[in-house]
Regions:
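Polar, low-complexity loop segments and adjacent catalytic/binding residues used for recognizing
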Residues: 1-142
Length: 142
C-alpha cells in the first residue's frame, strides 16, 4: 500500500470505504478484532493472505467491513462501520470492486474468492477450493 496525501490517506496500511470518490468516506489502520476482544494490527504488504467481509444492510443503512488473516474465523466486531443510505447510488446493473496500490513497488493483488447475495446472507467462501498455488497452500497449511 502507499499513503496518498492527495486523497487524505491516514497511513500506508489502511482500509477505507470509498463511495464514488478516491477519497475515503471513512478509514482506519488495517487490523482485526481478535477473540480476546482487542484489535491486532495487520500489515497489508506482508504477503500473508487476508479475508475481507463487506456487508451492507439496506434496512439499517449500515456498511460493515471486517478484516482478518485467512486462517482466522470472522471476527464478531467489524473493522469499520459506516451509516449511510446507498440506494441513491445503487443501480440495477453496476460494478463494484476492490482496489489497491503500492506506488512504485511492483506487486500483484488477487481476489481468490467472492460471495455475493442480495437481500440476505452471502454463502461462506470455500477456502479449500482456492487456487492450488504454493503460497495459498503454505498459508493454509494444506
Amino acid at each position: 500500500m502507499i499513503e496518498s496525501h492527495e486523497f487524505n490517506d491516514i497511513n500506508d496500511s489502511h482500509v477505507g470505504v470509498d463511495i464514488n470518490s478516491l477519497e475515503s468516506t471513512t478509514s482506519t489502520s488495517a487490523s482485526y478484532c481478535a477473540t480476546s476482544g482487542g484489535f491486532m494490527n495487520l500489515t497489508l504488504i506482508s504477503g500473508h493472505l487476508k479475508q475481507v467481509w463487506v456487508e451492507y444492510d439496506g434496512v439499517k443503512k449500515q456498511i460493515n467491513v471486517t478484516l482478518a488473516p485467512i486462517n482466522v474465523d470472522k471476527p464478531k466486531i467489524p473493522l469499520l462501520s459506516l451509516s449511510g443510505d446507498l440506494s441513491p447510488i445503487i443501480n440495477k446493473a453496476m460494478y463494484v470492486g476492490f482496489s489497491s496500490t503500492t506506488g512504485s513497488i511492483l506487486t500483484s493483488h488477487y481476489v481468490l474468492g467472492w460471495s455475493f447475495k442480495m437481500n440476505g446472507k452471502a454463502q461462506e467462501v470455500a477456502i479449500l477450493n482456492f487456487p492450488s498455488c504454493l503460497e495459498v497452500k503454505a498459508e493454509l497449511n494444506i
